[in-house]
Swiss-Prot record:
Site positions per UniProt: Important for activity: 95
Binding site for substrate: 49-52, 105, 110-112, 116
Note: During catalysis, the active site Cys acts as a nucleophile attacking the alpha-carbonyl group of tRNA-bound glutamate with the formation of a thioester intermediate between enzyme and glutamate, and the concomitant release of tRNA(Glu). The thioester intermediate is finally reduced by direct hydride transfer from NADPH, to form the product GSA.
PROSITE patterns, alphabetized: GLUTR
Annotated positions binding NADP(+): 185-190
Pathway(s) served: Porphyrin-containing compound metabolism; protoporphyrin-IX biosynthesis; 5-aminolevulinate from L-glutamyl-tRNA(Glu): step 1/2
Pfam families: GlutR_dimer, GlutR_N, Shikimate_DH
Protein name as catalogued: Glutamyl-tRNA reductase
Gene Ontology molecular function, alphabetical: glutamyl-tRNA reductase activity; NADP binding
Domain of life, source organism: Bacteria
Catalytic activity, as annotated: (S)-4-amino-5-oxopentanoate + tRNA(Glu) + NADP(+) = L-glutamyl-tRNA(Glu) + NADPH + H(+)
Organism: Shewanella halifaxensis (strain HAW-EB4)
Active site: residue positions: 50
Enzyme class of the recorded protein, top EC level: oxidoreductase
Length: 416
């Protein structure tokens, strides 16, 4: 038995099956306690996201963990088994490190997964299903994920449209904290853009949307101002950056509207990023002297270049994960040796205490001290060499030269 990781992810299973094996947030506490009861160590952590469900256990058989998963979700082995992956020992540790660093994600190097793994670990601690071994494993994993992000370029280059749009703004403006941003739309992409902007210090954001209530809901989270699409001409002159992503069939920002805004800005430059398909901003806006217009195609070429850069960084990251997983297992093995040494010393001390007690009793009864000491020495010697003698004899009879050589080395018989 050893560390075990089993899972299903976006590479191995359809959305339909991933939904069936997912754990609801309000049930994961009890689920981890149930899973931990199937292990000898009582240690278990469940990671459940939209793209993966993974179970990590210590001192457990993989087959038992799989059976528990199938039973918990009332799924047949035939449905689950073909989509499962399993790792043991060092490979299980390495897999956790790869997952946490974003090396196994749908978007290579994405940082969100690390936060999700940390949340799962916290929930496991709250459930009481983490002890020394898995606590050390997860803490090491978080350090390794940080090391990978620090020592490689795995997360440096934008590989999502939203991130690429904000990265472009960072290249053009020396500091985003003093810029005013107009976001057009209030869907998932614009929400992600707003999150990236806030993370980069943007304080002044205006969100324009056809449905004002949706814009207001988003603004509550990011401290932005909500307006309708009809109000855009009033706010456009104040905008240093405009990022648009709506489902409108026709352009929302025309050349005339932008030209008028630029005049009011006294021709201070304006960055416009159109990530909508079809376009939200008329292509002719690019002809204006102080307007810098980029489309989703421009961003896509940047993303493709950055993906190549991330793949190179991933090769370095894989080496780090491999090395750190090996070092963690070295720590595990050192614990095993400590336990063995402690057990051997305890056994030897018990033999010594028993024989000394007998010798003391004989001396108390008037026994000859020299004879008692000689008997003690002989019996102690025989007791201590009994197990090694049996092992040497067995290795010789079986012709096991490898074991015989190791035993001689351990017993110091080959010293000059």
């Amino acid at each position: 038995m050893s560390l075990v990781a089993i899972g299903i992810n976006h590479k191995t299973a359809t959305v339909d099956l991933r939904e069936k094996v997912a754990f609801a947030p309000d049930r994961i506490h009890d689920a981890m306690k149930s899973l931990a009861s199937c292990t000898q160590s009582g240690e278990a952590v469940i990671i459940s996201t939209c793209n993966r469900t993974e179970l990590y256990c210590n001192n457990s058989e993989a087959a038992d963990v799989v059976a528990w998963l199938e039973d918990y979700h009332q799924l047949s082995h035939e449905d689950v088994e073909p989509c499962l992956y399993q790792y043991k020992g060092q490979e299980a540790v390495k897999h956790l490190m790869r997952v946490s660093a974003g090396l196994d994600s749908l978007i290579l190097g994405e940082p969100q997964i690390l936060g999700q793994v940390k949340q799962s670990f916290v929930k496991a601690k709250e459930a009481g299903t983490v002890a020394a071994t898995m606590d050390r494993m997860f803490q090491n994993t978080f350090s390794v994920a940080k090391k990978i992000r620090t020592e490689t370029e795995i997360g440096a280059a934008a590989v999502s449209v939203a991130f690429a749009a904000v990265s472009m703004a960072k290249h053009i403006f020396s500091s985003l904290s003093t810029t005013q941003v107009l976001l057009v739309g209030a869907g998932e992409t614009i929400e992600l853009v707003a999150r990236h902007l806030k993370d980069n210090g943007v304080k002044a954001m205006v969100v324009a949307n056809r449905t004002i209530s949706r814009a207001e809901a988003m603004c509550d989270e990011f401290g932005a101002t909500a307006i309708t699409l009809e109000q855009i001409p009033d706010f456009l002159p104040k905008a240093d950056i405009v990022i648009s992503s709506t489902a409108s069939p026709l352009p929302i920002l025309g050349k005339g509207m932008v030209e008028k805004a630029l005049k009011q800005r006294r021709h201070q430059p304006m960055l416009l990023v159109d990530i909508a398909v079809p376009r939200d901003i008329e292509a002719e806006v690019a002809d204006l002297d102080d307007a810098f217009l980029y489309t989703v195609d421009d961003l896509q070429s940047i993303i493709e270049q950055n993906m190549a850069s991330r793949r190179e960084a991933a090769e370095q990251a894989e080496l780090i994960a491999e090395d750190q997983a090996y070092q963690f297992m070295e720590w595990i093995r050192s614990l095993e040796s400590v336990d063995s040494i402690r057990e051997y010393r305890t056994q030897s001390m018990a033999i010594k205490d028993e024989l000394v007690e007998r010798a003391v009793n004989k001396l108390a009864q008037g026994g000859n001290s020299e004879q008692v000491l000689l008997e003690l020495a002989n019996k102690l010697t025989n007791k201590l060499i009994h197990a090694p003698t049996q092992a040497l004899t067995a290795a010789s009879r079986q012709g096991d030269l490898n074991s015989l050589g190791q035993l001689r080395a351990v017993l110091g018989l080959d010293k000059d």
